[in-house]
Amino acid sequence: MLKHDLDYLELLSESFPTATEAATEIINLEAILNLPKGTEHFLADIHGEYEAFIHVLKNASGSIRRKVDEVFGGQLRQNQKRELCTLIYYPREKLELVKQSDERMEDWYMVTLNQLIKVCQKAAEKYTRSKVRKTLPPKYSYIIQELLHEDGVNPNKSAYISSIFSSIISTGCADDFIIAISETIQRLVIDHLHVVGDVFDRGPGAHIIMDTLMKYHHFDIQWGNHDMLWMGAAVGNASCMANVVRIALRYANLDTLESGYGINLLPLARFAMDTYADDPCTVFKPKLAQADQTYDDKSVYLISQMHKAISIIQFKLEHQIIARHPEYKMDNRDLFHLVNFTDGTIKLSSGVYPMLDMNFPTVDPADPYALTEQEQNIVDRLMGCFMRSEKLQNHLKCLYRHGSMYLTYNMNLLYHASIPLNKDKSLKKVRVGDKTYAGRELLDKVEEMIRTAYVAPEKSDQRLAAVDYMWYLWCGPDSPLFDKAMMTTFERYFIEDKATHHEEKGYYYVYRQEKAVCEMILKEFGLEGPDTHIINGHVPVKAKKGELPIGAEGKLMLIDGGFSKAYQSSTGIAGYTLIFNSQGLHLVQHEPFSSTRKAIEEMEDIKSITVVREVTSHRMLVKDTDNGHLLSKQVENLKKLLQAYSYGLIKERKK
């Protein structure tokens, strides 16, 4: 045995000072290694739609409904199963409804407690007792453990279980216990959650989604382009901040900014009302959902004025970054100086176009990118709100702690958008700072820049460059989070000709359906073999046009969650999520979610169907997973320690 092995084993012996303790740990770990792997749940592109997100999280993309079917089969009618599922998803709210309609609550409690324990037993069967114990609420831990490990078939045991239920009911704890057991089922059904980008965007509740994630037991995030925009704003990038506010106003979703993070928009509102008092702001009218009755005409007009004000500010701020960084090669996004303020046209490389709006009271034709004193004041005040928002800064910390540009996990490669490629399908070398990087090295370098923007000393050159780069990640042509020739925001507002709105996608989107390309990318990230996959979000799958969520002969899984209602008319569905359990991969297609109220009152679940099933040749065990490989290494080291004890190379220490 080598000396460095002995040095390590000496350290290990401090945790396991006797041969018996080392042997016991080997037995425990080998038992865990032979259990079925835990279930992973993959979501992407939530876009602030918190109600649909929370529902999919609660029903685990139909996994809880499947557990209920497995347990009760034909014993319960479909309506009874729906009622039980609704109770598990929304225990507090469902209990209130039951109390209003059911006078025989004691009988209902007895039946329901029996049903919930059976579902919980099913959800817990793949885990060790120790792991299950850690998921239980402390105040009911002992009693739930007792109930989980009794079968209820033996008459004596059945009477024992009934007596426990009777005690729970008679002491007035039934509601609290039902809530606890329902939430335990939710935790047990999903072992690990992967959010493959874009928590944020136009939806009304990104802050609620982040609050929910921060309470979740195990999760990771692969940053998306909209996440990067918010992260950039939260670390002090004024251009990112202006984009965030503009998008919120464009879709009239101010809840996340105002209610969620306490961002004060009043200074912007006053400025916009004064500056654009006689301006109809027609091209800046917000895009309202058909069912949105929240805003009257006066409110819509004010939002339009604010929308225009922040958009003009954004174009000016973006010029500052473009001027500071010629290496970004984004001069083609500076367009105000191409406007002919005399005849109301703009000259682009593709031609001369009439402008849809020419009322620019804050734009000096001689110096179109200069902020007025009032505009600078608005920027400073808004930036101060973003930097001082305690909740936003806490959510930023969570995004850094649990987030990354990519993740390799159990033979799958997860990233939100793209791996930049050349026309010949090779990995594209992209400049970051003063060097070029491709593939995995590129994503590693990009992540280093993102983290530098958060941890480097304030006002240092290193930090300022990294903060600027976060805006590039939002809209830069070679950004792995964007990967399009340009973002045509200016053209979409001011030019009617839709040909100017086109955003040419990078070669990744052209070639990602090819198996050889996906295998090349997987190999770049250290993954090879038949069971490896790329799991990707970002681009909605247009199911009604025949597009499929699986490509490259099964190597590519596209799981844009389709939570954003804006895309549902073009996709025809509400997107896809993915379940990876011990039996294989299950790609689930969802219909649009109506509302939490309907889910509770009318027991209306999201209609979901499994569209792709990739079943493994054998049931996957913990030992087949990344964590299992680490545990196997621990077993190997413990066996070496046991050998060292038996040969007297290390002396046992009695406690």
UniProtKB/Swiss-Prot annotation:
Belongs to the FBPase class 3 family. Keywords: Carbohydrate metabolism, Hydrolase, Manganese. Its EC number is 3.1.3.11. The keyword Manganese applies. GO terms for biological process: gluconeogenesis. Pfam families: FBPase_2. GO terms for molecular function: fructose 1,6-bisphosphate 1-phosphatase activity. Pathway: Carbohydrate biosynthesis; gluconeogenesis. This is Fructose-1,6-bisphosphatase class 3. InterPro entries: FBPtase_class3 (IPR009164), Metallo-depent_PP-like (IPR029052). It catalyses: beta-D-fructose 1,6-bisphosphate + H2O = beta-D-fructose 6-phosphate + phosphate. The keyword Hydrolase applies. Its cofactor is Mn(2+).
